[in-house]
Swiss-Prot record:
Gene3D superfamilies: Glucose-6-phosphate isomerase like protein, domain 1, Helix hairpin bin. Residues 226-255 are annotated as: Disordered. GO terms for biological process: translation. Belongs to the universal ribosomal protein uS2 family. This is Small ribosomal subunit protein uS2. It comes from Staphylococcus aureus (strain NCTC 8325 / PS 47). Keywords: Ribonucleoprotein, Ribosomal protein.
Amino acid sequence: MAVISMKQLLEAGVHFGHQTRRWNPKMKKYIFTERNGIYIIDLQKTVKKVDEAYNFLKQVSEDGGQVLFVGTKKQAQESVKSEAERAGQFYINQRWLGGLLTNYKTISKRIKRISEIEKMEEDGLFEVLPKKEVVELKKEYDRLIKFLGGIRDMKSMPQALFVVDPRKERNAIAEARKLNIPIVGIVDTNCDPDEIDYVIPANDDAIRAVKLLTAKMADAILEGQQGVSNEEVAAEQNIDLDEKEKSEETEATEE
């Protein structure tokens, strides 16, 4: 059974593409028809592609991998943040800083600065520093949290990227491709699907559509995590059973 229904997709307006004059011919195979100068996306293909993306992210999560959610356009910012947090993943929803993946060593120094400023406040340094300096530190902290707060706990490269609108996030995609990080993306009729490993043909401009699909990808990750925890429990139970059997064998021998 598909993880998403045609009814859900229709209600969220996932089928509305861009105007026919603003399209990428490579998206032709995902287009059902044209209506009033707007392309209509083939939702049967979207259902299938959502399944593929879901299963991929579920497997990444089962294997203990982390996913970076990227969506800096207004329609995606809230969904990307809330769904990444719900699944315990990382996100960028303001601006992609150049080198975020390819020059992570430098970016990680800026992330470290967040903790440094927090420690200064905890240690009471804000009480003794000049007021002007404290104001500047708070401004710096707010700026760092705004742009890097979503990846402050990211200690290594993500195993996958989930992107809303590849045209908008071309820098993120270029860096991920350079590092061979697989990309799942919500791809509208004006985008190049060749840049994306797991294409989800869909409206990337409607908040409801973006929310629905982003939530499904978060669900996939959560389901994968459930698989990991179930395996861990099963492994622990097997260890306990082995130890119990050994204990019973020892007692029988002693008797």
